[in-house]
């Protein structure tokens, strides 16, 4: 799939800025501005994916230590929607207590974020999809949140592995027929146009918001 024509080196989303970080879901003000969140295990490549979609090298901080980020990070895109980089969960170096805390934060966010319209569930294509992530997909459907399963690092699979992955995806789609799945490689760019289209379609639906008529999300110290 080709993206709309654009000037060379000009990003698809021209107006992007970091807005705020939150340590608790109940600190996030409700503004009526739609949100797309990125969730997944700590080593799935969420922050790298967000940077790749927005074509900014270091907008979302990518830590060399998976599981280090424990905040909800908000990025304002084209003055219309927020992309939210959620803390990762499930990395083996984290304690069980840390894992539970991150899952609690994620569920609190899902329960309280009235403006959340879409969840990108980011999963390394080299790994199995854990049961709790399958349940997360079901939770999204129950709450009228569009889930998109994003299988990252697809360039690291050989043809045999890719065939096995497609079979597993078919089984998941039998469970959730309406689930959209996108195979992604940040290295080759595969799948990124599809994800940008999902973000852009929400922007088009919302329309550009006038800054003077919206409250800015303020950061916390």
Swiss-Prot record:
Pfam families listed in its UniProt record: MMR_HSR1 (PF01926)
A cellular component term, taken from the record's GO annotations: cytosol
Sequence ranges assigned to domain EngB-type G in this UniProt record: 32-205
Gene3D superfamilies xrefs: P-loop containing nucleotide triphosphate hydrolases
Keyword Transferase belongs to the record: no
Binding of GTP, residues: 40-47, 67-71, 85-88, 152-155, 184-186
Coiled coil: none
Protein family (similarity comment): Belongs to the TRAFAC class TrmE-Era-EngA-EngB-Septin-like GTPase superfamily. EngB GTPase family.
PANTHER family linked to this entry: ENGB-TYPE G DOMAIN-CONTAINING PROTEIN (PTHR11649:SF13), MSS1/TRME-RELATED GTP-BINDING PROTEIN (PTHR11649)
Chain's role: Necessary for normal cell division and for the maintenance of normal septation.
The protein's name: Probable GTP-binding protein EngB
Native source organism of the sequence: Leptospira borgpetersenii serovar Hardjo-bovis (strain JB197)
